[in-house]
Amino acid sequence: MTNKIIQQLEAEQMTKEIPPFAPGDTVIVQVKVKEGDRQRLQAFEGVVIGKRNRGLNSAFTVRKISNGVGVERTFQSYSPMVDSISVKRRGDVRKAKLYYLRALSGKAARIKEKLV
């Protein structure tokens, strides 16, 4: 009984169209940032190292190298703070979680491009 009500409420809130992407893909996430009284979009571009598919609670982690320092950010897929997600490049990987990239740097951290 309660489960159906929760599923219905979650389905109503999951209206945002999210492009299909997988770990290894390079994505650009446009995030809404509020500075004082104005709001702007900030782009966060990096490699998806993990994805969690849980309906409304879905999330994904993006890793990028900024000024020689690795930066990871986890985004809730259906968050109102995430404006848009665009896939820049498809990566060819054999694992679902790419946490091993944290220990790699430079050319060793490159991911082959998927040829479709």
From Swiss-Prot:
A GO term from the CC aspect: cytosolic large ribosomal subunit
InterPro entries listed in its UniProt record: Ribosomal_bL19, Ribosomal_bL19_CS, Ribosomal_bL19_sf, Translation_prot_SH3-like_sf
GO molecular function: structural constituent of ribosome
Keywords for the protein's UniProt record, in alphabetical order: Ribonucleoprotein, Ribosomal protein
A single BP term in Gene Ontology: translation
Purpose of the protein: This protein is located at the 30S-50S ribosomal subunit interface and may play a role in the structure and function of the aminoacyl-tRNA binding site.
UniProt record similarity statement: Belongs to the bacterial ribosomal protein bL19 family.
Name listed for the protein in its UniProt record: Large ribosomal subunit protein bL19
Protein species of origin: Stutzerimonas stutzeri (strain A1501)
